[in-house]
Amino acid sequence: MDGEEAADIDETNSSNPHAAAVVATEMQAVAEAERPEEQQQQQMPQTSSGEADGDVDGDGVSAIAALATRVRLENMLEVVDNMFDEVSELMVDVTELMQRASELTGTTTPTPTAPENQAENAPEIEPAQPATPPEIAELLEEAIAANPLGHNVLNPGDDARSISSRHSGSDMSLDSPGSEDDSDAEAVPRWIIPENRVRSAVDMLVSQARNQDGGIATLLRRENFLQRVRSMVFSQDRVRGRESDEANLDAGNVVDEELSPELSPAPLDIDMEEGVRFDTNLPAEHSYFGPNLNRVPGVDYLEVGSTHRMLIFMHQHILFPGEVLPFMIDGSIIDEEIHDTGRDGVIFGVGFPLMQPPDDNPHKLYGVTCQIYEKGESGRQMVFYKSRALQRIVINCDDIQGPPQYIARNPTMKCYSKVKVLPEYFLPEPLKCIDMGSLNRFRDLPSMQDKFRRYQLTSTPWPLEACEEYSFEHIVEMARKKLEVHKIDTMPKCPIQLSYWLVRNLHLTEKMMRLTFLTDSVNTRLQIIGSTLKQESLFYCRYCNSSLAYCSDLFAMSKHGVQTQYCNSAGYIHETNTVYRIIAHAVGYSGEPSTEFSWFPGYQWHIIICKFCAQHVGWEFKAVDPNLAPKVFFGLAGSSVRIGKTSERTPTQGNPFVVRNLLHLVFREIE
């Protein structure tokens, strides 16, 4: 027996315990058949018989050798047949298990032995099913215990993190889908697809789905989803096998380029568009409420630190003093409030439940006071109102009387509470408080400002660091330069109003907005704003974390700035951020365009949805008049987007949690 045959038999013995006995029998038969042959060969030189006897002996040896070879081949074929029978029995068990699981869940699961029928019988897959029924969990445990090769199959209790770390030799990072380690490819049988192959295939399908209408939701609803995953795995294997070393190196360079942080595109110059510029005063008037709006007398500012009992509502967005809040509620609520207070002006409180209070007092609710300055006709049940936020307040939750209701959800009941007006502390720059007599005329000369400043520092006991701590002129100048591209020229001069105005127009993160709202010091608020001026930010989908637009593309379609509150015909209030453009292939469209109740006169609106998760993220506004500029812009809904750093953007364009759930689902079905 030669070395190759012995190696084949040894490999077979190691893979199948039943085959070891068969192969041992085979080796014994071959040894017995070869032993007479060796004896005949040893005795042939000593034989003195004739040529006829030698021929007979030679024929006998050949017959014995042929018989031994036939026995050996038959035994090897029997071993192979036994192996195929065991694999077939295993596949039948898997098929029965999947059918039983389908009966328990009420779905029709395709059998792995009939992939051609899978497109017709595939179930509608939901993207998030974290809970596994107890019956299915028991079935999976039985299958894992019965399958000696089941170390690559998911356990019922596995979560996304355990899936990601199952193979220590493979790179399972979603941030780098192009890099994978094939070290585990030979560690599992050929009929089990390695985990890193499935991950790469799913990542490719998700990337393709982003460029199609419907996004990931449509991908999951397709009947042939699992078959498409398998096909993608095999297609990638074929491509990987055909590529040469040089092609692999080039592909690696492409992946590195994709993973490199993408620079923010150059801002568009809207003034270059031909046509009549849109009047930014129109959105600020909220003319979609109609022309019959009446002025309401104003009210005085409340004393800082004083406590008042007033009508309060809840709101899903954070309002800052100076911001306009349009809303639509039952007119009887406000009319009764005017009658009860005996004042012409109306003031009420708005609380922000979504803004987390400080840890030292979790029973506090922060908000603002709002003054109604215009109202619609009172002849119908729902009345339009326009109000403006005035002062920051804090509400003790224990003092609330009545059920708190959101102002955007057509409140029908009243809710009162005691509120305390928060202070606003401002310390002017120390050097500006020093009277230099006749030298004051050099204070505002650009060529003399540095010399004048150095001269002031020599005449004061304060160090330079203390003076710069309360200096905000450089912050205002940096903010003005950054807002030049937004076409905003309504920056207030009062430091208190300026601090709130910058928060609304400099697209801060939610954490920074909370910090700026809670601080009572205007100087500290400006310092917080100044720390974010050099950061490049992106708008991300709040549901799946896909990047939608660059904050550098913000511009003002209203004289109030780039972020404004608008009310739709159903009374829901949207915080809208207007941008020139969005990232390519980031959104799709839903429904038909309409001009009804348009927030921007002369434009039609069209609902846009995230292409990755198919959730509503805003609107596209397109000019109806061809002479109106800009021709097209977008409004991103504040409740559907969040602001984050550009470094958070990943090539997968989606939340890793979504992809991990998808992988969990695929592994449970495909294995």
Curated annotation (Swiss-Prot):
<dbReference type="InterPro" id="IPR034750">
    <property type="entry name" value="CULT"/>
</dbReference>
<comment type="pathway">
    <text>Protein modification; protein ubiquitination.</text>
</comment>
<feature type="binding site">
    <location>
        <position position="541"/>
    </location>
    <ligand>
        <name>Zn(2+)</name>
    </ligand>
</feature>
<comment type="function">
    <text>Substrate recognition component of a DCX (DDB1-CUL4-X-box) E3 protein ligase complex that mediates the ubiquitination and subsequent proteasomal degradation of target proteins. Has an essential role in mediating growth by negatively regulating insulin signaling. It also has a role in maintaining presynaptic function in the neuromuscular junction synapses of third-instar larvae.</text>
</comment>
<feature type="compositionally biased region" description="Low complexity">
    <location>
        <begin position="39"/>
        <end position="51"/>
    </location>
</feature>
<dbReference type="GO" id="GO:0005634">
    <property type="term" value="C:nucleus"/>
</dbReference>
<dbReference type="GO" id="GO:0046872">
    <property type="term" value="F:metal ion binding"/>
</dbReference>
<feature type="binding site">
    <location>
        <position position="544"/>
    </location>
    <ligand>
        <name>Zn(2+)</name>
    </ligand>
</feature>
<feature type="region of interest" description="Disordered">
    <location>
        <begin position="104"/>
        <end position="130"/>
    </location>
</feature>
<keyword id="KW-0833">Ubl conjugation pathway</keyword>
<dbReference type="InterPro" id="IPR003111">
    <property type="entry name" value="Lon_prtase_N"/>
</dbReference>
<comment type="subunit">
    <text>Likely a component of a DCX (DDB1-CUL4-X-box) protein ligase complex. May interact with pic/DDB1.</text>
</comment>
<feature type="compositionally biased region" description="Polar residues">
    <location>
        <begin position="162"/>
        <end position="173"/>
    </location>
</feature>
<feature type="region of interest" description="Disordered">
    <location>
        <begin position="150"/>
        <end position="187"/>
    </location>
</feature>
<dbReference type="InterPro" id="IPR004910">
    <property type="entry name" value="Yippee/Mis18/Cereblon"/>
</dbReference>
<feature type="region of interest" description="Disordered">
    <location>
        <begin position="1"/>
        <end position="59"/>
    </location>
</feature>
<feature type="binding site">
    <location>
        <position position="610"/>
    </location>
    <ligand>
        <name>Zn(2+)</name>
    </ligand>
</feature>
<feature type="compositionally biased region" description="Acidic residues">
    <location>
        <begin position="1"/>
        <end position="11"/>
    </location>
</feature>
<feature type="binding site">
    <location>
        <position position="613"/>
    </location>
    <ligand>
        <name>Zn(2+)</name>
    </ligand>
</feature>
<dbReference type="GO" id="GO:0016567">
    <property type="term" value="P:protein ubiquitination"/>
</dbReference>
<comment type="similarity">
    <text>Belongs to the CRBN family.</text>
</comment>
<dbReference type="GO" id="GO:1900075">
    <property type="term" value="P:positive regulation of neuromuscular synaptic transmission"/>
</dbReference>
<protein>
    <recommendedName>
        <fullName>Protein cereblon</fullName>
    </recommendedName>
</protein>
<feature type="compositionally biased region" description="Low complexity">
    <location>
        <begin position="105"/>
        <end position="115"/>
    </location>
</feature>
<keyword id="KW-0479">Metal-binding</keyword>
<keyword id="KW-0832">Ubl conjugation</keyword>
<feature type="domain" description="CULT">
    <location>
        <begin position="536"/>
        <end position="645"/>
    </location>
</feature>
<keyword id="KW-0539">Nucleus</keyword>
<keyword id="KW-0862">Zinc</keyword>
<dbReference type="Pfam" id="PF03226">
    <property type="entry name" value="Yippee-Mis18"/>
</dbReference>
<dbReference type="GO" id="GO:0030177">
    <property type="term" value="P:positive regulation of Wnt signaling pathway"/>
</dbReference>
<feature type="domain" description="Lon N-terminal">
    <location>
        <begin position="309"/>
        <end position="537"/>
    </location>
</feature>
